[in-house]
A protein has these predicted regions:
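ASCE RecA-like P-loop NTPase motor cores
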Residues: 1-208
Length: 208
């Protein structure tokens, strides 16, 4: 049982960029915590690079049980804190959507237990249908067709990003953006700063 932990590409990109390699690193880190690997292959650059600490990885893992009530605003807050991006329609790993009493989450990596009690792991798209705070139905769905394919009794979602901003960090970021807004007279720059503030308020994550 061997994993490969690859180096991070230190180029800046926004939420629409592919995070495939980052998700692979989170998968390996999660596997290490769970004792799933006998060895991990990596490079000197990757081994020396900073990543999410074990306690943060554990803290930002989101667990959902079909038999337990679900607080929708709290779930949205936890997903945002775990690096997931809220969108209108889920089609890529690391996204989630809220539509009335329906929640769609595309986990880059996690585990789930099916209706037979068998536990599986990997990337998967999860749909939760609520009746009030109770889960009426929970299962996997195909992002391409938006159709549910099988029932799920429990799910554990690993964070979607390595570098996560907590609330104090986001508040500091908003203050920095506001200071830049006051200092600039360029209309294009001002519009971009407004978009950045809106993104922060909406829980959109920008990382590298």
């Amino acid at each position: 049982r061997t994993g490969f932990y690859m180096a991070r590409d230190l180029t800046f990109y926004n939420m629409t960029a592919s995070h495939e390699y980052e998700h692979e690193r989170i998968k390996v880190l999660s596997g290490l915590m769970a004792g799933e690997y006998d060895a991990v292959l990596t490079t000197p650059d990757a081994a020396l690079g900073y990543t999410v600490p074990p306690e943060i990885l554990k803290k930002t893992t989101v667990a959902i049980n079909a038999d337990e009530p679900l607080d929708l605003p709290e779930l949205a807050k936890r997903l945002t804190g775990a690096g997931f991006v809220r969108v209108d329609l889920v089609d890529s790993p690391g996204q989630f959507a809220l539509r009335g009493g329906i929640v769609d989450i595309y986990s880059p990596f996690g585990t789930f237990a099916d209706s037979d009690g068998d536990t599986k792991s990997g990337a998967y798209a999860l749909r939760i249908e609520l009746f009030g705070d109770d889960i009426d139905r929970m299962g996997l769905f195909e992002p391409d067709t938006q159709r549910m394919t099988q029932s799920v009794m429990a799910a554990e979602l690993q964070p979607a990003r390595e570098l996560l901003c907590d609330k104090p960090a986001l508040e500091r970021l908003k203050k920095l953006i506001a200071a830049q807004f006051r200092a600039t007279k360029n209309e294009d720059a001002m519009e971009e700063l407004v978009r950045e503030t809106t993104a922060v308020d909406a829980g959109i994550n920008f990382t590298f």
